[in-house]
Structures are given as C-alpha cells and as structure tokens.
Swiss-Prot record:
Disulfide bond residue pairs: 34-51, 36-41, 46-69, 77-89, 90-95
Compartments (UniProt record): Cell membrane
A Pfam family per the record: TGF_beta_GS
Membrane topology: Single-pass type I membrane protein
SMART domains registered for this protein in UniProt: GS
Protein species of origin: Pongo abelii (Sumatran orangutan)
Protein name per Swiss-Prot or TrEMBL: Activin receptor type-1-like
Sugar-modified residues: 98
GO biological process: one example: regulation of multicellular organismal process
Record-linked InterPro entries: GS_dom, Kinase-like_dom_sf, Prot_kinase_dom, Protein_kinase_ATP_BS, Ser-Thr/Tyr_kinase_cat_dom, Ser/Thr_kinase_AS, Snake_toxin-like_sf, TGFB_receptor
The keyword Zinc-finger is annotated on this UniProt entry: no
Amino acid sequence: MTLGSPRRGLLMLLMALVTQGDPVKPSRGPLVTCTCESPHCRGPTCRGAWCTVVLVREEGRHPQEHRGCGNLHRELCRGRPTEFVNHYCCDSHLCNHNVSLVLEATQSPSEQPGTDGQLALILGPVLALLALVALGVLGLWHVRRRQEKQRGLHSELGESSLILKASEQGDSMLGDLLDSDCTTGSGSGLPFLVQRTVARQVALVECVGKGRYGEVWRGLWHGESVAVKIFSSRDEQSWFRETEIYNTVLLRHDNILGFIASDMTSRNSSTQLWLITHYHEHGSLYDFLQRQTLEPHLALRLTVSAACGLAHLHVEIFGTQGKPAIAHRDFKSRNVLVKSNLQCCIADLGLAVMHSQGSDYLDIGNNPRVGTKRYMAPEVLDEQIRTDCFESYKWTDIWAFGLVLWEIARRTIVNGIVEDYRPPFYDVVPNDPSFEDMKKVVCVDQQTPTIPNRLAADPVLSGLAQMMRECWYPNPSARLTALRIKKTLQKISNSPEKPKVIQ
C-alpha cells in the first residue's frame, strides 16, 4: 500500500462493523432485516440493529464490498471515507441492498491548485516564521530525548522514530518489524512505544470469533491482516499476563502465535484491552477439524508442529537469548491455531506459569481464571496437584495434549472411514460440563476417551494411539514429556515406511 508524500504522516483507518448472522446482544430499538454478503454470512440476509455496507481495499487487491448487520459501536458509522475504506449505515428494511460506495480519490500533484505571486509574497514570511518555530520545537525535542535516554528510554524512542519514517515512505512494515521471527528465541515483544503506535493504526474489519473472555477480530494494519483479541473487562488479568509474558520472554518460534503489539485503548468512552498477533485465516484447530477431514500425513503434520510448540514452551533455554520454562495451563484445540502452511501454533498464554532454575522462582501470576474443565487432568480435578512444583503444571499440559491428539485422530481417514468431530468425553458429560461432572468421569470412574479400533490399521495412527495412552497415565510423573513426544513424532514422520510430513 502506497502512502504518498511523507508530509501526509501516518494513515489512520476507520472501519464500520459487519457482523455475521443474527445478533446476540443487539442495540436498543427494533431489529431490521439486511442484505448479507460477506464470507461469514449464514444466508442472504441477517438481522441486526442497523444495516451496513463496507468498501475496503487491501494491499495488492481490488476493492471489495461487504454487506451485513451492525450491532455494536455505532459511533464508527460516522467515520469519513478514505482512499482505502468507505462505509454506510442505514436503519430500514433491506436498505443496504442497492447501495454502492466509492473510495475517496487521491489528488495528484497536477490537480493541486497553483498559487499566484501575490499569495506567495503573503505566505513567505508566515512560512519562514513557522519554520523557525519548528526548528525551536525540534531543538527542544532533541534535549528531551537526551534526557529520556538517560532514563533508559532511548532505544524505544529510536524504534518509534524508525517506524514513523518507514510508514511515511510506504514500506511493507509488518514483515520488517517481525523479521526476527524464527524457530528459536530471538527477541521478545516490540518496544512499548512502537506497540502503541502499531495498535492505534489498526482498523477493525470483521469479528471472527467470540468467547467468554472477549472477541477476536481481523484487523488491517497498512493493508496487512492482523488478529486483534479484545479482552472483556473481567478478564483484564489474562490480558495483563499474556502481555507480560510476550514482553519479557523470548518467545519467537514458528509454532507459537506471533505477537505484534498490546495496548489499552479507549473506544466509545470505554476502555478496551487489545492484543495484536499474526492472523491465521484457518482459525483454531477446533474450527479446522469440524470442517476438514485429514489424511494421515496431514494429521502427523499437525501433531508434530503442535508438539514442537509445546516443547519450546516447556524447555528452559539458557544464555542471553534464553527463556524460562513455561507451562501453558489451558492447552486445548481452541487455543491451537492452524497456519496457512497447515502447521499448528499455540496461542492464549493468559494462564501460563514461568519457572527459572537459576532463581528457582515459580511465577504463577495473579489470575483468578481457571483452565477449561473438559481438558483438566485428574490431579487438578481432585485438587491433588502440587501448586508449588513447576513440573506439575507441565504434566497437566501433557494430559491435555493427549486429548488434542485424540481429536485429530478421530478426523483422520483410515480405509475410507472417519468419525465426525466431537470434543473429548462428549459421550459421558454435557456440552458445558461442571467441575463435578468431570471429576466423576476422570477421577472416580477413571475414564479416558475411547480410542477407535480402526487406528490400529494405520502405522501412523497406531503410534498416535499409543502416545495418547502414555499421555493419560493417572500418575502424572509417568506421562511422556513434551520433548519425548516431539522426538517420537518426528521419528514417525521420518520413517521410510510412514507417510512423509511435507515441509
């Protein structure tokens, strides 16, 4: 996306909201029926508080027009059109059906009106005075920056200056900023001032997910898609914890969700907590498995990459580019994302626990939220877990990893047979099981998910089935480690008689 002259500064995008389907919590007033034309529509029409039309042009693409219903943040309807985004809101039946929008044209230098000599004579002294004032302000700014450098802020201001300069020149920024994203720890989050700059340039495009703890939106930053997780006010501790971990721990890894920025913003007189990360259009592994059946080689690709991510979290890396050991504490298929290359990456570190052998300090954080009951290990359900022992938290991750393996195996085709997607323990607990429901099944009855007999007919899935059993040992210390799971899966993928995992 070309931003034009450096004098134009940073482009600030405003977008209207387009929701999918019928609203859950509409605004006040009667609902209207609207034409719905977007990738997330459930039908040709939807019902909402008002109708919307959004015209957006992303980098390297033709403008695309989306129609749908609006329910939240009506104030965004008053945004002015730009050369990249235009939107329209209305309140009557199917009022957005025949509406067509155009983007604001960029005025070329040849179209700009000239100034005559008399105007130049008048403006000359004024511009000279403004230049002197600007020089004075620049001098004061240099003095201020020198003072801030002494307080340890020089590096952050330098990074912020670089991002502003690059934005003015129209460079592709996201790849440049995150160029250090590699398979080993190579840097924590961006400097705080850069994060705030990035966060305030993001325009929300569409809501792609909702949960008890907030919403996930696809946003645009300089024409590139990013994911914006907006935390609800009651889950502030999860936002704070995840921000803290990303900004203090060297977590760059192919199989850990890439962090971009975190910021506390004000929208419509209310505070919003944003976490901005890489965007993966396939969504979570939970969503992917519901709509996609797997060949054995793809199932192995997903499991190997998920194991690599978990092993990277669990291991402590020493040295200047090191990291403490981290236990996830809420590992599940909804918190694993599927990338465009069909590898997995682990997300949601809001409950993570950190431990460093050097200081022997266990950093549990201060979050009242608990993990997902369906994926809780037996020692958590019967409250026998040693909360002062870091290994205990890693063992609970392994139990949950075995359940995710089971979800993948059910959706893998063997001899033309495959089961529908089901969550773990679907046949013995309700859709939203209580703590007592899970405790009875897992601790009292000592049940584990039933492994289909057909898995024994495939060399890959038979290995996965055995691995599941070793992840579900009642004795936590007897379970496999994440590193052993990773190496075993890699050995299966590299075995000549097994299907190869395509790299």
